Regions:
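Short, surface-exposed secondary-structure junctions/capping segments
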Residues: 25-40
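Generic cytosolic/nucleocytoplasmic N-terminal low-complexity/intrinsically disordered segments
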Residues: 1-6, 31-33, 44, 49
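N-terminal acidic leader/helix
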Residues: 1-29
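Short, flexible beta-strand-to-coil junctions
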Residues: 6-10, 34-37, 52-53
């Protein structure tokens, strides 16, 4: 699945991900993205997440 992420500062990022998990707390919103090669990254200060067909 393709994911578009927009951070609060306006930065846009695109990823081709296997899956993702979104979490929020009092400090920040963050997304954990897992890729097909078992690599995982975490991005914080996420404002918008959009999946693209």
């Amino acid at each position: 699945m393709k994911i578009k992420i927009i951070k609060y500062d306006g930065t846009e990022m695109f990823y081709d991900a296997l899956s993702f998990e979104f979490r929020t707390n009092q400090i920040s919103n963050w997304i954990k993205i897992k890729f097909n090669n078992d690599e995982t990254i975490v991005i914080d200060n996420v404002c918008v997440i959009k999946t693209i067909d």
